[in-house]
Amino acid sequence: MKKRALVSVSNKTGVVEFVKGLLEQGIEVISTGGTKKLLEENGLQVMGISEVTGFPEIMDGRVKTLHPNIHGGLLAVRDNEAHVAEMSELGIQLIDFVVVNLYPFKETIAKPDVTFADAIENIDIGGPTMIRSAAKNHKFVSVIVDPADYDVVLAELKEKGEVTDETKRKLAAKVFRHTAAYDALISNYLTEQMGEESPEILTVTFEKKQDLRYGENPHQKATFYKAPFAVASSVAYAEQLHGKELSYNNINDADAALSIVKEFTEPAVVAVKHMNPCGVGVGTDIHEAYTRAYEADPVSIFGGIIAANREIDKRVAEKLHEIFLEIIIAPSFSKEALEVLQSKKNLRLLTVNIEKTTSASKKLTSVQGGLLVQEEDTLALNEETIIIPTKREPTEQEWNDLKLAWKVVKHVKSNAIVLAKDNMTIGVGAGQMNRVGSAKIAISQAGSKAQGSALASDAFFPMPDTVEEAAKAGITAIIQPGGSIRDEDSIKKADEYGITMVFTGVRHFKH
């Protein structure tokens, strides 16, 4: 009996060549709508779906393949005598290949002017039903949803006269991944349209971007997946201009650097090591900003990741070329800068659209047996709601330093302390189990520069010991959330030493 293939695709890539290959193997082809028209325009003889169903396509094509003559041909168990007899009695013919990809729902909802009606109209019904039927019966049916698999199927047909069982199983698994992702996009879109923030079932879908050499350590396997829609200013959608492939740790560090540099509208440069900032500088131009970021910690920047929010020009590139770096991220690189930096063959150069995130996207964190979901911490300092409980208010220079330190501290692993002075960080204390310990590290790192600097803390002071350490170092201004039952002790201690202190009312833990 002649084998048959049903072909109905929205993504027409390679379909003409593939169907030509099927016809050359003596396979009869059934097709629908626009796919049938394209194939016939290219001189390929195919059968219309109505010839199989005996029923016309109706309701603007909404109903065309939902018919027993189609699904009977797909789902029949061919070594089941009862199934075979039933097919013969009803005049149903077998279908051996299904080549289908689905209505472009993802592409439709990505359009800025999409209407709800347009989105709904691009929810495919017949396509998912067909490929699920075929995938369920993959012992007998080959189902192809990805044009990348066309060559594999044709090669096996030419070499062996059939598609191997292993390939059929792989194709079937891909189908169910395909439909699961498709349904996840639909459910997420409708959930967002209804404004539901915490649905009883969370559906997420990501697409493979690349396999990684290894994970956080060489013995760990790892893969990088990207969100289905382009996320402004993200590593997942950055363009790599030069250098080795990104590693797992590179991606984490680059993401951290991007998150920090997006805090600034003025020219800024951020240096990151192990997802913590080791130097942040701002200036009137990107060269001044880089100089400050470098001077913030010229030791830790070695082997680090640099993110800038302005184009890298030749002058800055020549300075960057002097030290070993893993990655440089910027909105763009001048031609002359690229010539300088590309002389280092392993240095990764990424371009990305640096944009401040205006709405809180969801952050997913895996735990054993579950997943934590929260909004990203994008809350900026609100100068209208701050409280200054001390006798002295910040000077203009202190206020500038406080704001810089506050922007940075929320990106430092808790317990976090950041010292800033003259448009740059001068000390970062990260990840200590007690707050005063982080303060001591930041102060030690700053050395004599701590005199006259500003200190930011990601959470309140449980006791006044951090204020005492700040006073010893000559720090003159502090910014912190406030809210401790011992706030009054810290306020009194600050007043005792003439330190101005700002309460933001906002905590910025980062774990």
Swiss-Prot record:
Cellular component aspect of the GO annotation: cytosol
Matches recorded under SMART domains: AICARFT_IMPCHas, MGS
Domain MGS-like: 1-145
InterPro entries named among the record's database cross-references: AICAR_Tfase_dup_dom_sf, Cytidine_deaminase-like, MGS-like_dom, MGS-like_dom_sf, PurH-like
Pfam families in the cross-refs: AICARFT_IMPCHas (PF01808), MGS (PF02142)
Catalytic activity, reaction form: (6R)-10-formyltetrahydrofolate + 5-amino-1-(5-phospho-beta-D-ribosyl)imidazole-4-carboxamide = 5-formamido-1-(5-phospho-D-ribosyl)imidazole-4-carboxamide + (6S)-5,6,7,8-tetrahydrofolate; IMP + H2O = 5-formamido-1-(5-phospho-D-ribosyl)imidazole-4-carboxamide
GO BP: 'de novo' IMP biosynthetic process
UniProt GO MF annotations: IMP cyclohydrolase activity; phosphoribosylaminoimidazolecarboxamide formyltransferase activity
Coiled coil: none
Keywords, sorted A to Z: Hydrolase, Multifunctional enzyme, Purine biosynthesis, Transferase
Annotated family: Belongs to the PurH family.
Protein name: Bifunctional purine biosynthesis protein PurH
Organism: Bacillus cytotoxicus (strain DSM 22905 / CIP 110041 / 391-98 / NVH 391-98)
Gene: purH
